[in-house]
From Swiss-Prot:
It comes from the Eukaryota. This is Histone H2A.2. The gene is HTA2. The lineage of its organism: Eukaryota, Fungi, Dikarya, Ascomycota, Saccharomycotina. Its main location: nucleus. Belongs to the histone H2A family. It holds the Pfam family Histone. GO terms for molecular function: DNA binding; protein heterodimerization activity; structural constituent of chromatin. InterPro entries: Histone-fold (IPR009072), Histone_H2A (IPR002119), Histone_H2A/H2B/H3 (IPR007125), Histone_H2A_C (IPR032454), Histone_H2A_CS (IPR032458). The modification Phosphoserine is found at S128. The [ST]-Q motif constitutes a recognition sequence for kinases from the PI3/PI4-kinase family.
């Protein structure tokens, strides 16, 4: 009788693969699963739930970072700052709806001048007004 897992002696053991690697994700599936279990959201957590939630979180992070990177490039900066995150989120309709109640520290406000405060366009008098 041999101890262990019953394989051939001296055979290479299969390297373990994380759930993140199996799903092709960068964010940690195991950590999300642990946080779901310890967060008292439900008594039981299915095996697919943390994978799906991790994929959603990774997608949202990638989307926000891409838009913030574009905002940084538009401002001729190479580093993303909170202002770029604010501009990225507030200029995107869906992200603004999702994060409408979120305050970003050091984010500032969107530039906006009310129409009534803009100077009036000077129109040349037309022939119909001269009667």
């Amino acid at each position: 009788m041999s101890g262990g897992k019953g394989g051939k002696v001296g055979s290479a053991a299969k390297a373990s693969q994380t759930r993140s690697a199996k799903a092709g994700l960068t964010f940690p599936v195991g950590r999300v699963h642990r946080l779901l279990r310890r967060g008292n959201y439900a008594q039981r957590i299915g095996s697919g739930a943390p994978v799906y939630l991790t994929a959603v979180l990774e997608y949202l992070a990638a989307e926000i970072l891409e838009l913030a990177g574009n905002a940084a490039r538009d401002n001729k900066k190479s580093r993303i700052i909170p202002r770029h995150l604010q501009l990225a989120i507030r200029n995107d309709d869906e992200l603004n709806k999702l994060l409408g109640n979120v305050t970003i520290a050091q984010g500032g406000v969107l530039p906006n001048i009310h129409q009534n405060l803009l100077p009036k366009k000077s129109a040349k008098p037309s022939a119909s007004q001269e009667l």
